[in-house]
């Protein structure tokens, strides 16, 4: 049976770092970083970069070096998130415009409006999930609540705001090819490429957001 690791408080973790052969140049600074960002996020996530083939830390490795890599990675994630959000906003705007223009702002969540080559059951399941999300947000999201109470439906340009990037990607995939092409044309790429980009963006965004 694998022995469960015992809890160590920040001071104990600081000493544990030293026993691993990692150089600590400033006890107070290192302790604050452990408290603020967690030992696991800093050491466990990046330790392999600084270890040799014997699974021991390379000679001369300092905590500051490991933390610098953690900081670099964190800042890189923030950059990715910033530009993914920009692209997401653009796609949402164009997508809602295409759907509204071609299918109206009321009856767009109908199976016949989507790709006929996709199984109707799968499309209906996706539409049901979108409708469930609308119902869930009713009473919580101001715009959703307003449109349901006043008009009895939610237009695409409002719905699009509550969809995650993953849900947005699925909605785009369900569109008829001619509609996907109208969206992708705005980015000067094919609908096939945009579909793949959206899937990749969803994966990268989730990794960055959850610090995996």
Please provide the spans of the model-predicted regions.
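Long, contiguous internal "core" modules enriched in hydrophobic/ aromatic residues
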Residues: 1-212
């Amino acid at each position: 049976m694998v022995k469960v690791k015992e809890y160590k408080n920040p001071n104990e973790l600081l000493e544990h770092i030293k026993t691993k052969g990692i150089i600590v140049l400033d006890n107070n600074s290192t302790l604050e970083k452990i408290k603020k960002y967690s030992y696991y996020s800093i050491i466990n996530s990046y330790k392999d970069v600084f270890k040799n083939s014997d699974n021991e830390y390379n000679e001369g490795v300092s905590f500051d070096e490991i933390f610098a890599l953690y900081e670099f990675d964190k800042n890189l994630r923030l950059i990715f998130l910033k530009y993914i959000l920009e692209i997401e906003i653009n796609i949402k705007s164009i997508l809602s415009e295409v759907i509204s223009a071609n299918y109206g702002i009321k009856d767009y969540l109908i199976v016949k409006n989507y790709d006929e080559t996709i199984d109707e059951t799968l499309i209906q399941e996706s539409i049901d999930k979108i409708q469930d999300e609308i119902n869930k947000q009713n009473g919580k999201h101001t715009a959703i609540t307003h449109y349901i109470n006043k008009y009895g439906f939610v237009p695409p340009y409002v719905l699009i705001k509550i969809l995650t990037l993953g849900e947005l990607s699925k909605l785009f995939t369900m569109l008829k090819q001619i509609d996907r092409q109208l969206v992708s044309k705005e980015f000067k790429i094919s609908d096939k490429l945009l579909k793949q980009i959206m899937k990749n963006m969803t994966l990268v965004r989730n990794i960055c957001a959850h610090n995996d």
